[in-house]
Design a protein with these regions (language model features):
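Ligand-binding pockets and gating/stacking loops
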Residues: 1-249, 253
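N-terminal low-complexity segments that are often proline-rich with Ser/Thr-Pro
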Residues: 256-257
Length: 257
């Protein structure tokens, strides 16, 4: 029958539509190797993450975003919680184009996306074309696949200069959407806001969206800390699944994560 918790009442309503992995275990006694194992299949560094494998195996459905994107949030249950490292969404030995790209809250959602000061978009296009020719020549000379991945990264950044502002503009989202995800969804960087952003990424064709929410390491004060942490995630998680299911097919909001 399972254990029921009032702290996850909304999540209980979508339990039939989510996958919970109960078979995974590790001999690691510390958080870092354990979470590395969960995300990469090994406690050792240097292996590809789950999202990178999905990108590598299934490819991308959009030219305007990476196939794998990641968002972080800090919970209210325990602050600051355990650290999160970028290797958890790394590509390991796979081509670097498959690593996750971090989407942040605020005015600069993706680092190093803007053109240098004083450089117009047309000038940037010319620079990238010249740079691509040089990189192509170097790739033919050395056979280094990372050189080709670098070209793809530059081109993706150029396209994202137009696609990211549209992604992060929530002005056309109705109030009913924010009501569905909860009041925290209006606050950039919260788990609720990231869930809403995850739906927007999925409907734009991003293959894998991964949300990390820190603050689950409750050793003490469970009665006060754990309910707050669950409150962060319960309604938004259920809303994300319901939002995807509501527009499954033939609508463009086809949830594939």
């Amino acid at each position: 029958m399972g254990v029921r918790s009032p702290s996850s009442a909304d999540s209980a309503t979508i339990a039939d539509d989510i996958a919970i992995i109960r078979s995974m275990h590790t001999e690691a006694i510390n958080h870092d190797p354990a979470i590395t194992f969960i995300n990469t299949g090994t406690m050792q560094l240097g292996k590809a993450s789950l999202g990178a494998w999905l990108s590598y195996g299934l490819g991308s459905e959009t030219e305007n975003f990476p196939a794998y994107m990641v968002m972080l949030s800090q919970g209210t249950g325990k602050n600051p919680g355990q650290p999160i490292y970028s290797r958890l969404w790394g590509s390991g030995f796979l081509p670097s184009e498959h690593q996750g790209v971090l989407l942040r809250a605020g005015a600069d959602p993706v680092l190093y996306l803007d053109n240098p000061p004083g450089v117009k978009r047309s000038q940037r296009r010319g620079q990238l074309d010249d740079l691509a020719r040089l990189n192509q020549a170097f790739a033919q000379q050395t056979g280094d696949p990372e050189t080709l991945a670098r070209i793809q990264a530059y081109e993706m950044s150029y396209r994202m200069q137009a696609s990211v502002p549209d992604l992060t503009d929530l002005s056309k989202e109705p109030d009913s959407t924010f009501d569905l995800y909860g009041p925290e969804s209006r606050k950039p960087g919260t788990y609720a806001a990231n869930c809403l952003m995850a739906r927007r990424l999925v409907e734009r064709g991003v293959r894998c969206v991964q949300l990390f929410h820190r603050g689950w390491d409750q050793h003490i004060a469970l009665q006060s800390q754990l309910p707050r942490q669950c409150q962060d995630t319960d309604q938004p998680s259920a809303a994300l699944i319901l939002d995807c299911l509501l527009y499954t097919s033939p609508s463009p909001r086809d949830c594939k994560t």
